[in-house]
Amino acid sequence: MKENKSDSTASHISDTVKAGAGLSELNTVRFISENSDKVIKDLLNFGVEFDRDENNNFTFTLEAAHSVRRVLHSGGDATGRKIEEALVKKISSNQNIDIYEETLAVELLVDETNECKGVIVFNNLTGEYEVIYSSAVILATGGIGQLYKYTTNPSGATGDGMALAFNAGAVMQDMEFVQFHPTALAIDGEENRFLISEAVRGEGAKLVDADGKEFMQKYHEKRELAPRDIVTRANYCEMQKNHSENVYLNATCINKEKLAKRFPTISKKCLEHGIDISKDFIPVAPAAHYMMGGIKTNIEGETSVRGLYAIGETASTGLHGGNRLASNSLLECVVCAYEVANYLKTLELQPPKQISGTIKDIIEKYSDEIYLEEIDVSEMRKNLQNIMWDGAGIYRSEETLKNAFEKIEQLKLDFHRTDKCLSKSEYEFKNMLTVAEMVITSAIKRKESRGAHFRTDFTQTNDMSFHSCLTRTSLEDSKAFLRNQNSEIVSYRQIR
């Protein structure tokens, strides 16, 4: 922001590219950084109140791999929630916007010319299907954290948009790059883990072992403020070395009043577990946090399927490369949303034309009573999460990845659902299986370690930077690829 005199666009670009491990698209990075001010002004106009000091100046925090304090925050440590609340309020007040709750998109309608014409949705409350035609379909469905045993993501982060787009023929990019946050609150029995913000380390907190000894000096010159992938692997290594379930974050060096004001949500959550962060060490461990890959798009959100757009974590613009710089995700969301909206205005969209066949014909396959009763997928979901954590997690190898793929193939047989499912949970699990295979397939093909993708059998980074691009038309293609037969599942694209 221009109000931040210690920062510059050039500095932000440099930090983003360095964190991206050689995969960030420079043109994308530059565009998003240069357009940050105007979207922040929009958020302010929408009612988002970013924190300010006693002189009414914005306050900025320091996060990992940033060279200066540049990250705005709201409500102390509730930035995402505050932005979401303001946007929901804005949307709810607009009578031109229809909101469908408890409704899940299950298929994109793509005609014979490879143009998206709409979507089939499933109402989880009534069990009924509906066809919605549209001249433009925008996917903004978030990430895939629920594929993993430990995650900071909400229960709905099951990769639904990625699976929808992939099944519709869209090109996927960099699906092997899953970011694991180094500091999630590690409480026994809790697998959906509460995020301990990087900003706590930015304010001076240190990572320590059970004896209170700092260890990050052994791993990187920036210590606690090294890029996320490095801090995550450092924490994991210390946990393995000490046969422990967590390391600790020591925030007792931060003024008590500052902790309470700057991190009210974290303070409250920790107190619920008997942890006073002004006095006690916080038990933390890595957890799946963010997907750098996704549906390949440009800045305007265009995918390889005409009429289909994607924004945010479900998209892959090339901004984050192999490792996302802290807080760039929110910035990307709002900048790209702004660009998609303005781009669609220029197209002078016409009312959508129905594809061949009646609505009844289109949803007929979902209406047949093929299955008698709903499957309880909770145990299969846990099984998948364990498979992905062990086989395609922080550390992976060809052996662990292929083993994971074989287990997922068996899960698909056990699940035995093709098109129709009987509940939201079944549809989500079907999508999770699809995305899991994408992650594994891409991770096997990238025979190097780069950013968040670390191979124990290929620990070095190749000299050549490339994006992986994934397309798949059938399950047999994946099997052929994993058997080292001729296949075009994964291709590559040079960095621009």
Predicted regions span which residues?
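N-terminal FAD cofactor-binding segment of flavoenzymes
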Residues: M1-F50, P182-D209, K213
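Short beta-strand to alpha-helix junction loop
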Residues: S24-E34, V71-K89, Y100, T151-G159, ...
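Glycine- and aromatic-enriched mobile tails/lids
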Residues: D42, D51-V68, D111, R201, ...
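FAD-site-proximal beta/loop scaffold in flavoenzymes
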Residues: E107-V131, I275-T317
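A short alpha-helix-loop-beta-strand transition element characteristic
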Residues: L23-L26, I40-N57, D98, V171-D174, ...
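Conserved redox-cofactor binding core of oxidoreductases
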Residues: L44-E128, Y133, A140, A184-D188
